[in-house]
């Protein structure tokens, strides 16, 4: 199962990944921050979780520091974490759609 979202939808995806790490093959986070309140499970439960974090370097609503925090947390937990920073604001574009597509195909083809 793969889940993901943009902005607030991605915050929900973060929350689900933190609560149920072994339920998902992959999580796609686009332009989001970690939930305000969250807890983590035993780190070994995250080792098979794949996470793609995408953030716009020109996002005026959510600074890239939020993306870096999410990246650092999931790396610390041992998840397979990929980060991509696009030269966009708080939006999606063909570049980010393409990145998501490539990431998903690479995992499905394993």
Q: Residues of each region from the PLM?
A:
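Conserved catalytic-core motifs of eukaryotic protein kinase domains, centered on the activation segment
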Residues: 40, 64-65
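Gly/Ala-rich beta-loop-alpha elbow adjacent to hydrolase catalytic centers
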Residues: 4-9, 13
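Active-site signature of alpha/beta-hydrolase-fold catalytic machinery across serine-
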Residues: 15-19
